[in-house]
Amino acid sequence: MNAVQVKILNPKIGTDANFPMPTRATDGSAGIDLRACIDEPITIKAGETKLIGTGMAIYIADPNYAGIILPRSGLGHKHGIVLGNLVGLIDADYQGELMVSVWNRSDTDFVLNPAERMAQYMVVPVVRPSFQVVEEFNELSARGAGGFGHSGRQ
């Protein structure tokens, strides 16, 4: 897969210098930046979550791929701005506007400005295994059923 369909829902995108077409920030960037498609700044209070539109829809079509929306590391580390659902999974057959659940996990209000890069979008391959119901696994792994800290912290 080399292309997905992008539907521009807000006429500012690609025509207003503040709302460029979605692109990667650098040649080495894995994802494209998703910008806040808002008309005026929005204050996200400490602990609050807001759903913010991107002004576009992306249709992948190929069920062997999915889109994921991830937080931007700088916003998360410096300002406590992450995704309310931690990771957004966008199915290949979804055709609606990409929305970003923006969560301010800090104790300080945050102002999100129009066209500000708030998240990133990646297309990833999807593996669809069949499931085989068994009474017991055919081999024991070294880990077994140990979980939630089973392997220690060091």
Swiss-Prot record:
The keyword Magnesium applies. Its EC number is 3.6.1.23. Keywords: Hydrolase, Magnesium, Metal-binding, Nucleotide metabolism. Substrate binds at residues 72-74, 85, 89-91, 99. One of its GO terms (biological process) is dUTP catabolic process. It comes from the Bacteria. It catalyses: dUTP + H2O = dUMP + diphosphate + H(+). Its cofactor is Mg(2+). Gene3D superfamilies: 2.70.40.10. One of its GO terms (molecular function) is dUTP diphosphatase activity. It is an enzyme of class 3 (hydrolase). Pathway: Pyrimidine metabolism; dUMP biosynthesis; dUMP from dCTP (dUTP route): step 2/2. InterPro entries: dUTPase, dUTPase-like, dUTPase-like_sf, dUTPase_trimeric. Belongs to the dUTPase family. PANTHER family: DEOXYURIDINE 5'-TRIPHOSPHATE NUCLEOTIDOHYDROLASE. This enzyme is involved in nucleotide metabolism: it produces dUMP, the immediate precursor of thymidine nucleotides and it decreases the intracellular concentration of dUTP so that uracil cannot be incorporated into DNA. This is Deoxyuridine 5'-triphosphate nucleotidohydrolase.
